[in-house]
Amino acid sequence: MGNSGFYLYNTQNCVFADNIKVGQMTEPLKDQQIILGTTSTPVAAKMTASDGISLTVSNNPSTNASITIGLDAEKAYQLILEKLGDQILGGIADTIVDSTVQDILDKITTDPSLGLLKAFNNFPITNKIQCNGLFTPRNIETLLGGTEIGKFTVTPKSSGSMFLVSADIIASRMEGGVVLALVREGDSKPYAISYGYSSGVPNLCSLRTRIINTGLTPTTYSLRVGGLESGVVWVNALSNGNDILGITNTSNVSFLEVIPQTNA
């Protein structure tokens, strides 16, 4: 065992040995390792520090060995700030989203200095209109279906752009289907068709479509509304033609010009 043996230190029997093995350990302890008990046999383990914790090991053979565990104030400070920052900013972001999105939308759709409003072509319809025309299998591919409730002329500002068309019509009828048809001037049949329903009370019937522009020439469109094979449809009114809640109600047709994104 080399320099090995026993000696009496005060009242304690001490053992000193070179390359001693404890339990099932197969090699001597290395620098800064300690013996760690387990549920079976001891093992050699090395203590390490995690974020925010400082670990100082003094194992100079000429001095008393020591292990000092403390708090790394700088790292702990940064960790705490990061955690709090994430939570605070997350809460602020949620609050901003909840409280200001509508304000932003209202701003960009009402401020005439912003380009988005200029891109919209809005056509409000405020009259009460009785639509006696019907849409049937015989006339759906013609221009005879339904009743025209409005005409709209729009001029593209950019060749190759497209119009996103949105029609929201307040319609009432005795229970049954409602048909909306968008007609482009010069065509022999509707450009787009949509369907809605009324159970005797006013309902919002919508049509959504896109129109690709090939030039800068003004084009006129019309919107036709009618019952699905039967029934009279009222626009902006109750199914008997009276005002809804005694006030003027407004349907709307809008054209939004957009330019498709390219990879160029």
UniProtKB/Swiss-Prot annotation:
Secretion signal span: none
InterPro entries per the UniProt record, alphabetical: Chlamydia_pGP3, PGP3-D_N, pGP3_C
Presence of the UniProt keyword Protein biosynthesis in the record: no
Keyword Membrane: no
Effect of residue 61 to S: In plasmid PCHL1 and plasmid pCTT1
Effect of residue 191 to C: In plasmid pCHL1 and plasmid pCTT1
Keywords: Plasmid
Domain of life: Bacteria
Segments traversing the membrane: none
Other facts noted in the record for this chain: PGP3-D is required for growth within mammalian cells.
Official protein name in the record: Virulence plasmid protein pGP3-D
Organism: Chlamydia trachomatis
Organism taxonomic ancestry: Bacteria, Pseudomonadati, Chlamydiota, Chlamydiia, Chlamydiales
